[in-house]
Amino acid sequence: MPALRTRVAVAVAVATLMAAPTGVASAVPTTAAAPTDGWQQKSFTYAMHKPWNLDLSERYRYDSGTKTHTMWVYSTDEPLEEGSSTDPRTEMRWNQEYTSGKHMWDADVYIPSGTNGADFMQILRVKHPSGTPATDIMLRVSSESDGTVKRYTDQVIKSGVYNKWWNLKVAHDADAGKIQVYADDRLVLTVADRGSATRHFKNGVYHHGSGRAEARFRNIHYWVK
């Protein structure tokens, strides 16, 4: 009899497990969608902008081993064009221009401490209606809180960025007039663009502060949707 009771107990236990509600499976956490899900990666080309009177090698370096682009500039440097009143810069000017569709800039970014008052990524409105802004968004780093990135000088994107690699994605839906910014794949900002225009991406250092400004970029990608 004890053996029979054991067999019955086992059978009941198995039946109970088989009858367990399937809803229990929903407790298993699901992986959140990545910002690039549904997007298609495209190749891109670019031209380099730098102080007009200097050789590119004096303000730009590419490490083929780590595939890292390093750009720097000093507040005392000359502008892009001789006689211009704009601030000094060393930047990658993307050649891919667009007026519609969805476009995303994606890269790992490293900003050394001491870089203060430099824009390191922007969407430039290269052709825009008279009286409208020249950019849809500019991301600037300041020295506060060990390196703080803001949209222009207001909304905070990320703090504590000095001397470390982190990922930045800027997605622009030109048809809907919407820009979304992701820091380490977390959506941190959604804002409207500034109306119809022909645009392109830029990254590097466009320096409005004092001293030296530097930014490094690797794993740079261009996505469309």
Model-derived segments and spans:
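Short tryptophan-centered beta-strand motifs in secreted/extracellular beta-sheet-rich domains
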Residues: A107, K164-D173, I179-V181
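Extracellular glycan-recognition surfaces and repeat-rich motifs
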Residues: T45-M71
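Short strand-turn-strand beta-turns centered on an Asx-Gly dipeptide
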Residues: Y182-R186
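Ligand-recognition surfaces built from glycine- and aromatic
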Residues: A33-Q41, Y98-D106, N116-A118, G160, ...
